[in-house]
Amino acid sequence: MEKILQGNNILTDILWEPESLSYLDPGAQAAFRGMVKANRRLVYKDTSGHLAVGYCEKISTLYEPFAIYIKELFGDGIYFSHSDDNFTYLLIVNEGRIVSGTDCFIEREFFDELMRHPEQYEHLEVTLLTEVQLSVVIEKCHAHQLSLKRRRRFIISSILFGGIIFLALLALALHFLVAG
């Protein structure tokens, strides 16, 4: 799964800001404030309409956040996918908010231990991510990237066309000034 996502410029391991930073110690709060300055900011709305934020190291818009697509397409739940190298991808979406500390690959033993004690999230459905769900996310990401590419081309073409018109008008004005 990880290689498929990386091959399609889809990001995991994004650091999602918790709903409240007040329970964190001052060092962790300072680390989150430092991430605001150093990383790309990904913003979405949870089910109550509040803004939620994630931070990733890749600043290019060519990369899409996997967790936001899962949240938008499939809603609340505990999503996981086992890989061959004894790691498991884990994502928890609760009340439309991506839970901080998830959207990452963890050791399978740790995942199994977490699933034995799901008290805080026992109301959420546990879902194994399948190839079908991955392909839906990849398709949506490609469609979004295509629309971004079209918008970039339109903006660049508009600027180029505007520049050409400006230069033509400037040349015409200079011609009338010189010709008298």
Language model: regions and residue ranges:
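Cytosolic/nucleoplasmic/matrix-facing N-terminal domains/tails
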Residues: 1-125
